[in-house]
Amino acid sequence: MERLLIVNADDFGLSKGQNYGIVEACRNGVVTSTTALVNGDAIDHAAQLCRDVPKLAVGMHFVLTLGKPLTAMPGLTREGLLGKWIWQMAEEETLPLDEISHELECQYQRFIDLFGREPTHLDSHHHVHMFPQIFPIVAMFAAERGVALRIDRQSVLNADDLPVALRSSQGFSSEFYGDAISEALFLQVLDASADRGEKSLEVMCHPAFIDNIIRQSAYCYPRLTELDVLTSASLKYAIAERGYRLGSFLDV
């Protein structure tokens, strides 16, 4: 049985090094898809780069934890910036959901303005769209627009609660991440998905060349290791050998 594999590189637009790494992993590796932070420092560079890489599917990486929002968000920002305090606010059930909904709409429109088309799908920086309070907002938004959505079905959600019109892969893995990146780890993710009987799988990744912005990230040098693994000829062969076809969210 042929299975669909979506290898999605998060953080398009974060920095030029990130952008170049994603494009390299698409042109010479197994990355098929990416998601863009429309408030990223290098988002204009990302939009320009992808014009020369038509096979790279581009979705939107909804941002509520980094940089400046596109709208006034007094209930979520501190000194005008987004940050990881959103986790505490979620636990305290004090998230400004109206502000978040409006910011989602504005980031979506900004994506269209930048890339000249709608995103292939939606996900989010640090998976904040999977918060129980935020997920219904993003899921309904995606369903109404016919846009696919990253869903981690294993961790949080009851599939019966999903909007009928919502498209997603059957499986999602964030396990190709950390200090132990290797081809073997990537293939373990695929084998585990196959054992669960999933017909489609998204694997998250973050391939990048190191620059000054990436150096400031808590997740820095493993991004370069990811790039090495994702561009190895042996990985592409092993994926095909396992019966996976590389594709994007346009295929789900």
Swiss-Prot record:
It catalyses: N,N'-diacetylchitobiose + H2O = N-acetyl-beta-D-glucosaminyl-(1->4)-D-glucosamine + acetate; diacetylchitobiose-6'-phosphate + H2O = N'-monoacetylchitobiose-6'-phosphate + acetate. The keyword Magnesium applies. It comes from the Bacteria. GO terms for molecular function: chitin disaccharide deacetylase activity; deacetylase activity; metal ion binding. Pfam families: YdjC (PF04794). Its cofactor is Mg(2+). It is found in: Cytoplasm. Its EC number is 3.5.1.105. One of its GO terms (biological process) is diacetylchitobiose catabolic process. It is an enzyme of class 3 (hydrolase). One of its GO terms (cellular component) is cytoplasm. Belongs to the YdjC deacetylase family. ChbG subfamily. Involved in the degradation of chitin. ChbG is essential for growth on the acetylated chitooligosaccharides chitobiose and chitotriose but is dispensable for growth on cellobiose and chitosan dimer, the deacetylated form of chitobiose. Deacetylation of chitobiose-6-P and chitotriose-6-P is necessary for both the activation of the chb promoter by the regulatory protein ChbR and the hydrolysis of phosphorylated beta-glucosides by the phospho-beta-glucosidase ChbF. This is Chitooligosaccharide deacetylase. It comes from Citrobacter koseri (strain ATCC BAA-895 / CDC 4225-83 / SGSC4696). The lineage of its organism: Bacteria, Pseudomonadati, Pseudomonadota, Gammaproteobacteria, Enterobacterales.
